[in-house]
């Protein structure tokens, strides 16, 4: 998959850090009319998700919010989340903060990310790499720690620029039976540290982050790492992703959602910074990080239909089609990897914020089941 080096600080109902169903156990602010609405509040979270390689992910966390004197948005938002994956047998922890000062619209962000779930497979480099051996051959046990301070500045309504330094450290275990060990050594394996700069431009006009029916989103991000710490040759990475939504009815009874993304690395990039395609976030129906290259692209389409407005919530069906590939300098390939499938979705109390989707995607290699809050995009 395209691993997000820049992990945006998400509002908790659709938790980008846990990638799970975030169930708020305390009520949300329904209005700002009473004095109680402006008091600091701490909300506990509980989550669960499923994908074929990582399997069941169980998570919990809290979000703490403070307001200025009768002012929106909040002056402080703190988030702490932890999750454990039963299939990968490892964890993910995220601590994040958003701080705003009175007056200027600038947001000061801080994020600490520690995880063993960012890179779990390695099939070699290439768009037609072999995947016929037992799954244990391709497994990777890597722990990553990311420290990411940044400043976000609004450029226009719904258009934001984020930039700052970053520090990243990874430790990859040398398991002798894996492809990573038998075909290596690979630059970046073992202990590897890197520092650099990052920037991101984000345009978001969607009407809902978890289950959009209208609007669009465009994100362009870049990172650059000089020859410092473990980095021998400077390298950079750029990625872009765009999605749009068209619906019929109000509220929507049918929504066509399409998304496309691409990424590329330049210079002496370590193996964990290559472009990966395949898995729950790019091309479903394939293993996580199934294909690795210097450049990559993917596209997704979903047709989401409302089937019934039951008393407890909306029930619907979804059809999907995914496609993607990677490019490497020493390989000539015209293959695009595709998958298709469908599933069900449910919006509790008729609120799209409360949407849960369960889909199956079939590719030439396997069929995968995916459970998540909202939709993929």
Where are these regions (language model features)?
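Outer-membrane beta-barrel initiation region
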Residues: 2, 30-118, 162, 172, ...
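Transmembrane beta-barrel strands of outer-membrane/channel proteins
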Residues: 46-50, 78-84, 97, 108-127, ...
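Outer-membrane beta-barrel transmembrane strands
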Residues: 50, 54, 134-168, 190, ...
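Outer-membrane beta-barrel translocator domains and adjoining extracellular loop/strand segments
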Residues: 73-75, 92-95, 120-128, 173-180, ...
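Extracellular loop and loop/strand-boundary signature of outer-membrane beta-barrel proteins
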Residues: 81-83, 132-137, 182-188, 224-230, ...
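Outer-membrane beta-barrel translocator/channel fold
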Residues: 83-93, 109-145, 262-278, 356-360, ...
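Outer-membrane beta-barrel "beta-signal"
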Residues: 198-199, 342-346, 351, 366-377
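Extracytoplasmic gating/loop element in the C-terminal half of outer-membrane beta-barrel translocons
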Residues: 246-328
């Amino acid at each position: 998959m395209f691993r997000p080096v820049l992990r945006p600080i998400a509002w908790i109902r659709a938790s980008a850090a846990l990638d799970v169903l975030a169930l708020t156990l305390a009520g949300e602010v329904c209005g700002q009319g009473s004095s109680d609405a402006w008091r600091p509040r701490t909300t506990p979270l509980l989550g669960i998700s499923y994908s074929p390689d990582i399997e069941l992910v169980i998570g919990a966390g809290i979000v703490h919010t403070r307001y200025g004197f009768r002012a929106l948005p909040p002056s402080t938002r703190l988030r702490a989340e932890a999750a454990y994956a039963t299939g990968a047998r490892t964890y993910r922890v995220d601590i994040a903060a958003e701080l705003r000062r009175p007056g200027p619209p600038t947001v000061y962000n801080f994020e600490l990310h520690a995880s063993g779930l960012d890179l779990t497979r390695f099939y070699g480099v290439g768009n037609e790499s072999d995947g016929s051996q037992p799954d244990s051959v391709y497994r990777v046990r890597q722990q990553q720690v990311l420290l990411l301070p940044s400043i976000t500045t609004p450029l226009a309504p719904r258009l934001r620029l984020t930039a700052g330094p970053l520090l990243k450290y990874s430790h990859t275990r040398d398991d002798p039976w894996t492809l990573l060990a038998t075909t290596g050594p690979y630059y970046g394996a073992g202990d590897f540290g890197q520092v650099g700069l990052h920037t991101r431009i984000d345009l978001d006009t969607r009407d809902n982050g978890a289950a959009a029916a209208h609007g669009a989103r465009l994100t362009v991000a870049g990172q650059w790492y000089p020859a410092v710490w473990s980095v021998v040759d400077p390298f950079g990475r750029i990625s872009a992703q765009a999605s749009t939504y068209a619906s019929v009815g109000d509220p929507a009874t049918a929504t066509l959602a399409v998304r496309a993304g691409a990424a590329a690395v330049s210079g002496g990039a370590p193996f964990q910074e290559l472009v990966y395609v395949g898995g729950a976030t790019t091309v479903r129906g394939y293993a996580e990080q199934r294909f690795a290259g210097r450049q990559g692209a993917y596209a997704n389409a979903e047709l989401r239909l409302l089937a019934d407005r039951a008393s407890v919530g909306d029930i619907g069906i979804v059809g999907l089609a995914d496609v993607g590939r990677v490019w490497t300098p020493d390989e000539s390939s015209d293959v695009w990897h595709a998958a298709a499938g469908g599933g069900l979705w449910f919006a509790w109390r008729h609120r799209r914020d409360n949407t849960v989707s369960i889909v199956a995607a079939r590719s030439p290699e396997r069929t995968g089941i995916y459970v998540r809050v909202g939709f993929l995009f």
